[in-house]
UniProtKB/Swiss-Prot annotation:
The gene is Hsp83. The keyword Chaperone applies. GO terms for molecular function: ATP binding; ATP hydrolysis activity; ATP-dependent protein folding chaperone; unfolded protein binding. GO terms for cellular component: cytoplasm. It is found in: Cytoplasm. The TPR repeat-binding motif mediates interaction with TPR repeat-containing proteins. The keyword NADP does not apply. This is Heat shock protein 83.
Length: 716
């Protein structure tokens, strides 16, 4: 005879909360299972902790586990744990009459638009059961009390009574009477999916009672008896049925006394463990093989390849957390797609999954790192909004970055593997130099470049510094589109001739790197394409430079006047050997390469383009025969039309060779054709045939307008 039930009213705030949960639509109802499994795990933690000092606490049940039993016929989902259990007092107080401190706060958060998945953070995760159930019973047995059953259909009250039906031994059994429109939560596949997503690394076995089939050979008599028995049972129970799949037509007909055999399919149930991948991060790293790390990495990331490197560590003291970080072998094709949710580092709190896209857990430039972080100090189910303000998370982030730096540093010791890593993730490191001022120096150590002395190999800035000549003060570099382009550039002629190594930076992101990486190990990084290049020189070289400056002063002034606003100034160069001239930019303006990159931007700022790309100066090579002959020609006749033609042509050609683009390529081409005609001895005024005229088109004169002519007069 059932015990008489006591009825209790829900505390007002809890009644409001339940009403809110029941009457509001939430899309991610699946979190109810996470919350109930999390509570079960907490109950198991408590009994395990008590058993450390008193092993007899486990006499009522040695095995610690969580079990899920879906029953489609009855429409119920049962969650059983062998945890500490609840006394009658616990059931009354914890499940209804005493509001948790977070109840009101959670309701306010919900009404303000917070996600239902935050419910556990406020200590009221149990009530999420009413997202999918219209009635819940909780049977519980604590070592210090009898077995009791709590029941409520959320109508403002609940009942508690003693329960003598099925002894639990110890622990809690929650039965959810699933709503008619939520029966998909009784499907094996759905339950497995939710457990795999949210509770895969709970520290106790999660078992699911699954229904399976097996073939069994029986005699006709047995089959008939079984069938009759099944038909009888089918009226009032959902026990396994036996299904006839046909007779064996090849039975031995000669022996009439022999009983015919039948193959039948027999349904049966068994427990299937859902979380076989144990929390590997909770184990001692010394006890874990590379194969185990590999298996865990693949289960975590769904990658088919092994990881490239792994870092397993724990932090203890005022703050406690464990972490397992992996570097993959390849970069995903959508690594820098900001709109895509990245599944990189999974955040757990006490082995309960919280979120897999915690942006504040690691900087964006390290978004290729995969792994898990399991904190003992964060509140369970902390929201994204609260994470941004959480001091614990900031400390975890700092430690993760530090350990990632250590991991990459360890990888640099294996040259072959580091090359694989660098080929895939060099952009991330360079983005880090751009964004992370605290770790800029460390990240600079990881960078690798081709240089004028490295051949086909990459070398580090540290290697470069170790090879610097005694009289070399700076690290020289050049940016450009490709190794071939920069290695043949006019800018590196003198530097290479002096025996100084030049770093080749050929990725667009390198331009952003050098804006922030001004020096390395006390050595200033100097661009060979910018004005003011200083090279070590002796007294004789210094004297020659001063003489050249005086000798070509008048030519520089003339060229400056001819080019007018196209250049800021014309000066004698100390960087050229084989080229007659080059275009350099100001220290704070864009290089030719940067200007090219910015012009390619779809959303470029035209105003910024104007003042950042404006400052150019033309440097001439005093030792080049073209420049020397031009000087002599200009000294002989400053008004010589050919001098102006040649100056403009030299300027436009040096623009191209220095990496800039021409505003009017057609005009430049016409000038080249005119020069070709002169070289071939074709008279400028000689009439062309009709065919020639059609093919040549209207070539602009080299001196097109009166404005240019007036500049020539000013030179006089």
């Amino acid at each position: 005879m059932p015990e008489e039930a006591e009825t209790f009213a829900f505390q007002a705030e809890i009644a409001q909360l339940m009403s809110l949960i029941i009457n509001t639509f939430y899309s991610n109802k699946e979190i109810f299972l996470r919350e109930l499994i999390s509570n079960a795990s907490d109950a198991l933690d408590k009994i395990r902790y008590e058993s450390l000092t008193d092993p007899s606490k486990l006499d009522s049940g040695k095995e610690l586990y969580i079990k899920l039993i879906p029953n489609k016929t009855a429409g119920t989902l049962t969650i059983i744990d062998t945890g500490i259990g609840m006394t009658k007092s616990d059931l009354v107080n914890n499940l209804g009459t005493i509001a948790k401190s977070g109840t009101k706060a959670f309701m306010e958060a919900l009404q303000a638009g917070a996600d239902i998945s935050m419910i556990g953070q406020f200590g009221v995760g149990f009530y999420s059961a009413y997202l999918v159930a219209d009635k819940v019973t909780v049977t519980s047995k604590n070592n210090d009390d009898e077995q009791y059953i709590w029941e409520s259909s959320a109508g403002g009250s609940f009942t508690v009574r003693a329960d003598n039906s099925e002894p639990l031994g110890r622990g809690t059994k929650i039965v959810l009477y699933i709503k008619e429109d939520q029966t998909d939560y009784l499907e094996e596949s759905k339950i497995k999916e939710i457990v795999n997503k949210h509770s895969q690394f709970i520290g106790y076995p999660i078992k699911l009672l699954v229904e399976k089939e097996r073939e069994k050979e029986v005699s006709d008599d047995e089959a008939d008896d079984d069938k009759k028995e099944d038909e009888k049972k089918e009226m009032d129970t959902d026990e396994p049925k036996i299904e006839d799949v046909g007779e064996d037509e090849d039975a031995d007909k000669k022996d009439k006394d022999a009983k015919k055999k039948k193959t039948i399919k027999e349904k049966y149930t068994e427990d299937e463990e859902l979380n076989k991948t144990k929390p590997i991060w909770t184990r001692n790293p010394d006890d874990i093989s590379q194969e185990e790390y590999g298996e865990f990495y693949k289960s975590l990331t769904n990658d088919w390849e092994d990881h490239l490197a792994v870092k397993h560590f724990s932090v203890e003291g005022q703050l406690e957390f464990r972490a397992l970080l992996f570097i993959p072998r390849r970069t995903p094709f959508d690594l820098f797609e900001n709109q895509k949710k990245r599944n990189n580092i999974k955040l757990y709190v006490r082995r309960v999954f919280i979120m897999d896209n915690c942006e504040d857990l690691i900087p964006e430039y390290l978004n290729f790192i995969k792994g898990v972080v399991d904190s003992e100090d964060l509140p369970l189910n902390i929201s994204r909004e609260m994470l941004q303000q959480n001091k614990v998370l900031k400390v975890i982030r700092k430690n993760l970055v530090k350990k990632t730096m250590e991991l990459i540093e360890e990888l640099t010791e294996d040259k072959e593997n580091y090359k694989k890593f660098y080929d895939q993730f060099s952009k991330n490191l360079k983005l880090g130099v751009h964004e992370d001022s605290n770790n800029r120096a460390k990240l600079a150590d990881f960078l690798r470049f081709h240089t004028s002395a490295s051949g086909d190999d990459f070398c580090s800035l540290s290697d470069y510094v170790s090879r610097m000549k005694e009289n070399q003060k700076h690290v020289y570099f050049i940016t450009g589109e490709s190794k071939d382009q920069v290695s043949n550039s006019a800018f590196v002629e003198r530097v290479k001739a002096r025996g100084f190594e030049v770093v080749y930076m050929t990725e667009p992101i390198d331009e952003y790197v050098i804006q922030h990486l001004k020096e390395y190990k006390g050595k200033q990084l100097v661009s060979v394409t910018k004005e003011g290049l200083e090279l070590p020189e002796d007294d004789a070289e210094k004297k020659k430079r001063e003489e050249d400056k005086a000798k070509f002063e008048s030519l520089c002034k003339l060229m400056n006047a001819i080019l007018d606003n196209k250049v800021e100034k014309v000066v004698v160069s100390n960087r050229l050997v084989d080229s007659p001239c080059c275009i350099v930019t100001s220290q704070f303006g864009w290089s030719a390469n940067m200007e090219r990159i910015m012009k390619a931007q779809a959303l470029r700022d035209t105003a910024t383009m104007g003042y950042m790309a404006g400052k150019k100066q033309l440097e001439i090579n005093p030792d080049h025969p073209i420049v020397e002959t031009l000087r002599q020609k200009a000294d002989a006749d400053k008004n010589d039309k050919a001098v102006k033609d040649l100056v403009i042509l030299l300027f436009e050609t040096s623009l191209l060779s220095s990496g800039f683009s021409l505003d009017s390529p057609q005009v430049h081409a016409s000038r080249i054709y005119r020069m070709i005609k002169l070289g071939l001895g074709i008279d400028e005024d000689e009439p062309m045939t009709t065919e020639d005229a059609q093919s040549a088109g209207d070539a602009p004169s080299l001196v097109e307008d009166t404005e240019d002519a007036s500049h020539m007069e000013e030179v006089d």
